[in-house]
């Protein structure tokens, strides 16, 4: 029997054999049938019908009706693929759980590209879910509703969200959810998400092409540096419009210019203590620093931003990603408000 080529191709793409495609299509078109009827209508050799039916039953696409002879019926595509999708999601969850249990070695950098907006948004969400300290989100306001729930879930995990947007939306739903900083910036075409300074997702020219914009996710340091530098330029021209501090004892940043801006706004009125994991630029070793924040440098023109931390070994300067002139470089900054 003739099957539309696009249907045959689509089913083969998800692992259906030629006989499985013919059998499922035959049952959809002609309704419940015996093995002999399936063979006659589909052209499948009779001795291959039963193993094909068994395979489709295991997949959840066909059911068996008891009787003499036995009759077989296809589940509708909506029901069959609902089951199939759930099965795939269960497998995906098991993979993610097992992957999280594996101690990962440091992986080489990579880049993943897409021309699908929906796929790019999934990459964006995946990046948000992996965050531990801070996510920076730059988005045109028309896409805010698409990611609203994802931002709330990120805040609820204790991760700081720093949002840049052209029009300030209703944020009442975000109160008490976590530490949320909203800055207004008007020149927005791209949607950018940067997570902990370790990976970045960029959906380019999203406002002009919301169906198939060129998009990528990358862990290459060079690309992260490029996008980080772009975000600093956006920061320079933005204004802080909303600050929600839901966890004053656990305020996390990876972007030092955000951490310094927070210190600038609060140090006069509050004591700020810090727990920082940073690389000693002299020895190259990772160290944990604790102490009271006693000062800061925020000079965007000279590209210098750091905090001055009073530790048991004296006052040290902690810079952010790609720090050079400071004592330490850090992307793991936690503030505790006194």
Swiss-Prot record:
InterPro entries: tran_reg_TrmB, TrmB-like, Tscrpt_reg_TrmB_C, Tscrpt_reg_TrmB_N, WH-like_DNA-bd_sf, WH_DNA-bd_sf. It comes from the Archaea. The keyword rRNA processing does not apply. Residues 33-54 bind DNA. Gene3D superfamilies: 2.30.30.690, Endonuclease Chain A (3.30.870.10), Winged helix-like DNA-binding domain superfamily/Winged helix DNA-binding domain (1.10.10.10). Keywords: DNA-binding, Repressor, Transcription, Transcription regulation. Sucrose binds at residues 303-305, 321-326. Repressor activity is regulated by binding of different sugars to TrmB. These sugars can act as inducers or corepressors. Binding of maltose and trehalose results in derepression of the malE operon, and binding of maltotriose, larger maltodextrins and, to a minor extent, sucrose results in derepression of the mdxE operon. In contrast, binding of glucose causes stronger repression of the malE and mdxE operons. Maltose may also act as a corepressor of the mdxE operon. The keyword DNA-binding applies. Contains an N-terminal DNA-binding domain and a C-terminal sugar-binding domain. Belongs to the transcriptional regulator TrmB family. Homodimer. This is HTH-type sugar sensing transcriptional regulator TrmB. It comes from Pyrococcus furiosus (strain ATCC 43587 / DSM 3638 / JCM 8422 / Vc1).
